[in-house]
Structures are given as C-alpha cells and as structure tokens.
Amino acid sequence: MPVIKVRENEPFDVALRRFKRSCEKAGILAEVRRREFYEKPTTERKRAKASAVKRHAKKLARENARRTRLY
C-alpha cells in the first residue's frame, strides 16, 4: 500500500493527487480489477499467451514499418 506523508501547509487536493499517482505507479487498481472475478488457470494462461502473441506482432509491425521508411 503506497504511503504518503502530508507536508506542512499542503492542501488536501495535492496530497490526494500524490496518493493517486503513487497508487497508479504501484499498479493497485489494475491488480484489483484483475482479481475482481475468479479466472481459471487455463483461461489465465490462454489470456497471457494471447497478449504475448499480440505484443510480438506489434513489435514486428513496428520494425517492418521502420525498415520501409528508411530507404
């Protein structure tokens, strides 16, 4: 859990913004959304594999686009 110390004479809005930013960096909301419903291990592996394939395809597309523009 991210912890922030409220500085002297610091407005509440600024402290809240810093807390939200630290929660976002820690990935707490993404973790909560991921754990909201139970996901079977096979489904979890399938989703992870699909995202890896998508990442790889995106990387290849970027590299191919870079090569075609440099002629």
Swiss-Prot record:
Residues 43-71 are annotated as: Disordered. GO terms for molecular function: structural constituent of ribosome. Keywords: Ribonucleoprotein, Ribosomal protein. This is Small ribosomal subunit protein bS21. The gene is rpsU. It holds the Pfam family Ribosomal_S21. GO terms for biological process: translation. Signal peptide: none annotated. InterPro entries: Ribosomal_bS21, Ribosomal_bS21_CS, Ribosomal_bS21_sf. It comes from Edwardsiella ictaluri (strain 93-146). GO terms for cellular component: ribonucleoprotein complex; ribosome. HAMAP family: Ribosomal_bS21. PANTHER family: MITOCHONDRIAL 28S RIBOSOMAL PROTEIN S21 (PTHR21109), SMALL RIBOSOMAL SUBUNIT PROTEIN BS21 (PTHR21109:SF22). The keyword Ribonucleoprotein applies. Belongs to the bacterial ribosomal protein bS21 family. Residues 60-71 have a biased composition (Basic and acidic residues). Residues 46-59 have a biased composition (Basic residues).
